[in-house]
Amino acid sequence: MAGRTMQAARCPTDELSLSNCAVVNEKDFQSGQHVMVRTSPNHKYIFTLRTHPSVVPGCIAFSLPQRKWAGLSIGQDIEVALYSFDKAKQCIGTMTIEIDFLQKKNIDSNPYDTDKMAAEFIQQFNNQAFSVGQQLVFSFNDKLFGLLVKDIEAMDPSILKGEPASGKRQKIEVGLVVGNSQVAFEKAENSSLNLIGKAKTKENRQSIINPDWNFEKMGIGGLDKEFSDIFRRAFASRVFPPEIVEQMGCKHVKGILLYGPPGCGKTLLARQIGKMLNAREPKVVNGPEILNKYVGESEANIRKLFADAEEEQRRLGANSGLHIIIFDEIDAICKQRGSMAGSTGVHDTVVNQLLSKIDGVEQLNNILVIGMTNRPDLIDEALLRPGRLEVKMEIGLPDEKGRLQILHIHTARMRGHQLLSADVDIKELAVETKNFSGAELEGLVRAAQSTAMNRHIKASTKVEVDMEKAESLQVTRGDFLASLENDIKPAFGTNQEDYASYIMNGIIKWGDPVTRVLDDGELLVQQTKNSDRTPLVSVLLEGPPHSGKTALAAKIAEESNFPFIKICSPDKMIGFSETAKCQAMKKIFDDAYKSQLSCVVVDDIERLLDYVPIGPRFSNLVLQALLVLLKKAPPQGRKLLIIGTTSRKDVLQEMEMLNAFSTTIHVPNIATGEQLLEALELLGNFKDKERTTIAQQVKGKKVWIGIKKLLMLIEMSLQMDPEYRVRKFLALMREEGASPLDFD
């Protein structure tokens, strides 16, 4: 049918303006027909028609969105012709529609189910014409939405013929909505509309992970496992498209607690997590900064941290970006409630405020709180439950592989500029630096650099750099080894000075009893290293005073080559209260649990217990603490050897402490003249002739003297003139009650 000229008019009713139809008088066209409206030779628009008596014959009425789309003005003359669809090619298979609230004042954050929307759309607009770029108004759940047709695909012609689908889909500009057309809704850019359900397009999401990051660039070494665990627990759900997460009913992890010894990379890891993510810059807060002298200000500071996240969630709902808040030293503000002295309860209300913000009545799903501490025991337990800081990750001392990575990172610049000597073997350094934290390894590299630089400084009246030699500056293996020996000692390692004083005179193997003690000690060391069934091995060396128990314990510890050796000795706790003693002992054991292999020597147990026979008196608090620590197994994957020493086995028996040790080894005194002569020969203080004289007096006789006391007597007698030495030594032996020696 040839076209006719008609005049554009305003849509007569609001109801008709929601129908997406052009409205005519029934004298002109019939309801349900389709027309092509031509506004110029190159601009054609297809509309479906409805009739209404209030429209003047010769006029065609359009709604405001239709007039906008077709560029029509009221009263404009346009050419209108009937249009018929080719059902084989122009039935809509799928149509993508951009959706947003029609009026900004009606915005809300309620979720809208796209499946229900699609069903309503097909019902309202069945058998209607749609074109790419068309604008229309859609009413759903008493809300008005503005729609824009983005893309149309024709239905597979095979389906229309009742045959199996051929999989061919063709893009078309104009199509007809039929009962089995599919509609996919796409949220308009910057819209706060919250769409749920399957009938929505997959949004072009920016990955939250930065594409160009790697561990070495981040300066993190030795934390691969920890990082992958954090990623699995905290970020895996955020990488997936929101619609899949929504279908699973999955909630994102909101909090991570990183804990472990100082200098192992907690702060570094948290800082780099922020860089790894394509999120906004994280807010980094030092725990004590939150506190304020004014009432209520501390709580307000917590609220300010979460204000941006709350505002964005209110505006964008599920599509809000990720907000990261990092609390360094979180134990400063999140101590156990009720543990702080004073009547103000400021700390308690700060904890309460933080608890309610992370997971309170109004839940935020767009935050990630990272807390760091080396005292996780101080933190309120309500903060550690799932839904709050639920991922608890220990950032412990790096193993050999981790130390290798860390040293690689800290020497990378030197290697790049050829300042690292060829004789430096990073693998060797990684083996030698047992129980070094990341910060201590960085300190080692710094110390080696300063040693190398020091070689090129002229030692004169002025401090000058020898520029000729400075050009050839190289950090050598010797620099690293010197720094390892003199400058950097690991906090959780073995300080040789601790036990060197106990074995400064060496171990005098005066007989089988000493050899047996050392052999048994070696067996226990091997058991600790190799046995999976006994991660905790404890041994008590008991014997009379001055028999060398502490020296033997220190020797067994030294020979073990464990990376962590500590001596818990009463001489370091002089004047301590009972509570302070318990805390000092607990700290030594807690530090030991952080190392893969540890040895703790508990020296002179009866002195630790404040035992005196008069009364008798002892500290029950220290006794109970020690009993618990002796029996407590180390964490999984860690092994601990405890060596105790005592001169009062009978007292420990009464206190029921002997049962706390796996085994007991007796360390005897020198008991025979032959053993005494063997000890004198090994010490080498007396000449052969002098020893022969002593032998005549002691051979075949019983003696009873500790090796420590023997050393003291020998040193005293050596202060005499040579001819009186032997006489003095034998006299001292007799005075000590070592034996009833008869001599002239």
Swiss-Prot record:
The alphabetical list of record keywords is:
Acetylation, ATP-binding, Cytoplasm, Hydrolase, Magnesium, Metal-binding, Nucleotide-binding, Phosphoprotein, Protein transport, Repeat, Transport
Phosphoserine is carried by which residues?
207, 569
Could you tell me which InterPro entries the record lists for this protein?
A: AAA+_ATPase, AAA_lid_3, Asp_de-COase-like_dom_sf, ATPase_AAA_core, ATPase_AAA_CS, Cdc48_dom2, CDC48_domain_2-like_sf, CDC4_N-term_subdom
Q: Which reaction does it catalyse?
A: ATP + H2O = ADP + phosphate + H(+)
Task: Look up keyword rRNA-binding and say if it applies.
Answer: no
GO CC list: cytosol; Golgi apparatus; myelin sheath; plasma membrane
Q: EC?
A: 3.6.4.6
Its localization reads:
Cytoplasm
Q: Where does ATP bind?
A: 505-510, 545-552
Highest taxon of source? Eukaryota
The job of this chain, per UniProt, is described as:
Required for vesicle-mediated transport. Catalyzes the fusion of transport vesicles within the Golgi cisternae. Is also required for transport from the endoplasmic reticulum to the Golgi stack. Seems to function as a fusion protein required for the delivery of cargo proteins to all compartments of the Golgi stack GRIA2 leads to influence GRIA2 membrane cycling.
Q: Could you give the subunit structure recorded for this chain?
A: Homohexamer. Interacts with GABARAP and GABARAPL2. Interacts with GRIA2. Interacts with PLK2, leading to disrupt the interaction with GRIA2. Interacts with MUSK; may regulate MUSK endocytosis and activity. Interacts with CDK16.
Q: What is this protein called?
A: Vesicle-fusing ATPase
Query: Organism source for this protein?
Result: Mus musculus
Gene label: Nsf
